[in-house]
Amino acid sequence: MNKIAKIAALAALALTCVASTACADFNADKSITVISREEGSGTRGAFVELTGVEQKIDGKKVDMTTDDAQITNNTAAMLMTVAGDEQAIGYVSLGSLNDTVKAVKVEGVEATAENVADGSYKIARPFNIAYKADGQSDLSKDFVAYIMSAEGQAIINEHGYVGSNDAAAYAGNGAEGKLVVGGSSSV
């Protein structure tokens, strides 16, 4: 059985609309270059759902991303593509934001961890940890406990995501070994 630990307080994914830092050179007479993530990307899925780009048609969810969108396959490529085109707009996780692009205000609200935490920045979703609950190793349990601890949450906050400020201190269970972890390019 798979278990998903929702980490709403741990790491709200603020899907931040980003534009080139060269926006002073933006030409309103030119077309905007839409940059999107690949189909199947969790970041894309959240973005289209939260912004209304995903619509229900005949009872099925349909991603209405423009066919003209340039597609990138990871966060770094999204940032590089947007940074290289002053007419471009795309989206990344808040914690992935860097100085090569700038966040676009949504409904007049800046994309900050504080605004995500207080709910005023609306384009946000939780990150999740998925693992097998049956037969979970002591090492795996310890890793999840660390992530959810005050120390783990501090790392989340330091990287621009939204962590919980009321988590308990990490106690640890003394487990040692090798743990293989996979996940999103958004973190």
Model regions and ranges:
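Exported/periplasmic ABC-transporter solute-binding proteins
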Residues: C23-V187
